[in-house]
Amino acid sequence: MSCRSEHIWIQPITGSRKTSNLCWAIILFLGSLGFLLVGTSSYLGRNLISLFPSQQILFFPQGIVMSFYGIAGLFISSYLWCTISWNVGGGYDRFDRKEGMVCLFRWGFPGKNRRIFLRFLIKDIQSVRIEVKEGIYARRVLYMDIRGQGAIPLTRTDENVTPREIEQKAAELAYFLRVPIEVF
């Protein structure tokens, strides 16, 4: 859902707050919590989970391994929850023809460079470029070629877009910025 007028185009960017990331974080948390509870049950010799008796799983070696997997899964799950709450990769692209500026903003990890803010003059934009790699893992990425800066990606590399969608995005952006389109 982008906001567009005659002179300004603001395009929001979805970061790590995607449904798939949320589903993986929930599944990983519940699975690793289950592993940790089973490992702890085998250590204590009591049923913390009533699905099966704790006597069926020996603490050494199965209980230790399950506890280790549970702890490792909780660490990975907490990493996912942190990236979701910080919205890493989220932000916006603002194209302003009136001021002649392009502003790209992204949220990063907490610290010194939490806010990533790039500014360019529209006159420095050489072209809008589409890079297509076909095959089993097809990839279509939209870039903006900046004079002296190189190519800056505007779409996520893991975003699975159809050729028609990427062409339409590139055509709209090139028309708005009044620059040519290149395909690689």
Curated annotation (Swiss-Prot):
It is a multi-pass membrane protein. Its main location: plastid. InterPro entries: PSI_Ycf4_assembly. One of its GO terms (cellular component) is photosystem I. Keywords: Chloroplast, Membrane, Photosynthesis, Plastid, Thylakoid, Transmembrane, Transmembrane helix. Belongs to the Ycf4 family. Seems to be required for the assembly of the photosystem I complex. This is Photosystem I assembly protein Ycf4. It comes from Daucus carota (Wild carrot). The lineage of its organism: Eukaryota, Viridiplantae, Streptophyta, Embryophyta, Tracheophyta.
